[in-house]
Regions:
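Non-catalytic interaction/regulatory modules that flank or connect domains
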Residues: 127-214
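Glycine-centered small-residue hotspots that permit tight backbone geometry or close packing
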Residues: 12-16, 197, 216
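Low-complexity, intrinsically disordered regions enriched in charged/polar residues
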Residues: 2-3, 163, 220
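Extended catalytic/binding region for NAD+/ADP-ribose chemistry, centered on the ART fold
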Residues: 209-229
Length: 229
């Protein structure tokens, strides 16, 4: 409850990190509260006003924030890994130094969000311009090497996986690279075929970078990443 949070804030010693793991916060107004250095791992916030809340140095790893207002909240140096922020108002949030690996930002409002060079997994993982090489794993453990041209649209969310609108198939090899193949089939769409030397293109490419599981040619920047998928 809000009262429990207030009590923990008042009674904690300097440097103490109160733990609120796997807690459920529902139908309350926490706006403007100073919750720095707290552990909210795996907790859920449902219909909670979190505007201007100070989450500095907090862990909200794998926490659920879907649909709440976090307008102006401070997540500086916070662990935000795999947290869900679907549909959240995150305008003017401070995420400087925060780690957003795997965080879900689908349909979140991100206008004027503040990040810096220390912010992890918020910027595009793949180069935004120029031609690049990519790799993807297909049916029967065939690994496809792709050339993504300079004019191809490309995106990435908060994971190493990327998407592009078109690519040329350079090679198709086995995991150990001892065998080569002429074609390979997508793990997601069995009708999508990659043929050596040919171009593949997705006409209805979704340009929303925060929509991870959507239309596009999914690829990885490193071959080893594709192998472990």
């Amino acid at each position: 409850t809000k009262e429990t949070l207030l009590k923990a804030m008042k009674s904690r010693d300097a440097g103490e990190h109160p733990v609120f793991r796997e807690c459920e916060f529902k139908d309350m107004d926490l706006s403007g509260m100073n919750l720095h250095n707290m552990d909210f791992t795996l907790s859920s916030f449902q219909n909670v006003n979190l505007e201007r809340v100070n989450f500095e140095n907090c862990s909200v790893e794998n926490a659920l924030f879907d649909g709440n207002s976090l307008h102006g909240a401070n997540f500086q140096n916070a662990n935000m890994k795999t947290a869900a922020f679907r549909g959240c108002d995150m305008r003017e949030c401070n995420i400087k130094g925060a780690n957003l690996y795997g965080a879900v930002l689908e349909h979140a409002k991100l206008d004027d969000i503040q990040s810096d060079e220390a912010t992890q997994w918020f910027r595009m993982h793949c180069p935004e311009t120029g031609p690049i090489l990519g790799y993807k794993k297909c049916v029967n453990d065939r690994v496809v090497q792709l050339l993504i041209p300079a004019d191809a649209k490309r995106t990435s969310a908060t994971l190493p996986s990327c998407r592009c609108s078109k690519a040329k198939v350079l090679s198709i090899k086995s995991f150990d690279e001892t065998e080569e193949f002429e074609e390979a089939w997508s793990l997601v769409d069995e009708n999508f075929v990659y043929r050596k030397g040919q171009w593949v293109e997705v006409k209805d490419f979704n340009e929303d970078r925060w929509m991870d599981s959507t239309t596009g040619i999914h690829f990885w920047m490193e071959r080893k990443e594709a192998l472990s998928y």
